[in-house]
Design a protein with these regions (language model features):
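Serine-dependent carboxylesterase/thioesterase catalytic core
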Residues: 1-8, 12-23, 30-122, 143, ...
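Histidine-bearing beta->alpha loop at or near hydrolase active sites
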Residues: 25-30, 168-172
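C-terminal catalytic-base region of ester-bond hydrolases, centering on the histidine
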Residues: 120-195
Length: 195
C-alpha cells in the first residue's frame, strides 16, 4: 500500500498533535517477513520516547505481527483499522479462485498462516471495524453481515483487544473518515475509544 493512501488520516492525526510517519509496503510483492523487517528498521530509526502504530487492513495485521514478534519497547498502543486479524474470508475465497493467488501475491502467506491473536498485555490494542458493505470483497464472495465490503466485523475482534468499535464506514473510505480519525486519536491518547 502506498503511504499516500494514509494522507488524510496522517494529516488529521497531526492536527490532533501527533508526529506522524507513514510507510509504504508492496502488498502484492512483499512477504510478511519482509514487511516486518521494514517496519522494525523504520521504527528503530525513530527518535521518540514513545511510539504508537496505526494500520489499515493488511497494515493492521502487520502491526499486530510486529507487536507479537519484535516490538520496540517504546511502542505503547496500536489502532487496527478494518484489519482482518482473525482471518479473512474474502482473501481465503479469492486465494481459491482462478488467478486469486496471483492477485494476492506476497500477502498470500499472511492468509495461510495459522491465526495468532495473542499480544503482550503491555501493548494496548484497539480495533475499528466498518459496517457499510462497500468494497471489493463483495465481488469475490458473499460476506456475512456486518462487514465493510472486504472484512467481516468478527474478523476484526480478538480477546486481547483493549477496545473495539464498529462504525458505519466502508473498508477503503475509513481512511478518509473524520470520525475514524477522531476515534484513532482518542485511543492513541487514552487507550480507549470515545463513546
Amino acid at each position: 500500500m502506498n503511504r499516500w493512501v494514509m494522507s488524510y488520516l496522517a494529516l488529521a492525526l497531526r492536527r490532533e498533535g501527533f508526529a506522524v510517519q507513514t510507510l509504504s509496503y508492496r502488498t502484492m510483492r512483499g512477504t510478511l517477513a519482509e514487511h516486518l523487517a521494514r517496519v522494525a528498521e523504520r521504527i528503530a530509526a525513530l527518535e521518540a520516547p514513545r511510539l504508537h502504530l496505526v494500520g489499515h487492513s493488511l497494515g493492521g495485521v502487520i502491526a499486530l505481527r510486529y507487536l507479537q514478534r519484535r516490538a520496540d519497547p517504546r511502542v505503547r498502543r496500536a489502532v487496527l483499522l478494518g484489519s482482518p486479524v482473525a482471518g479473512c474470508r474474502a482473501a481465503a475465497d479469492l486465494a481459491r479462485s482462478s488467478g486469486g493467488e496471483l492477485l494476492l501475491g506476497g500477502s498470500l502467506g499472511v492468509w495461510r498462516e495459522p491465526v495468532d491473536v495473542s499480544v503482550d498485555p503491555r501493548f494496548e490494542v484497539g480495533a475499528i471495524a466498518g459496517t457499510v458493505a462497500f468494497g471489493l470483497g463483495r465481488m469475490v464472495t458473499r460476506l456475512p453481515k456486518p462487514n465493510d465490503g472486504v472484512v467481516c466485523l468478527d474478523e476484526t475482534k480478538f480477546p486481547a483487544l483493549r477496545d473495539h468499535l464498529a462504525l458505519p464506514v466502508g473498508h477503503t473510505l475509513m481512511l478518509a473518515s473524520p470520525q475514524i480519525a477522531r476515534q484513532t486519536a482518542a485511543f492513541l491518547r487514552n487507550g480507549e475509544f470515545r463513546r
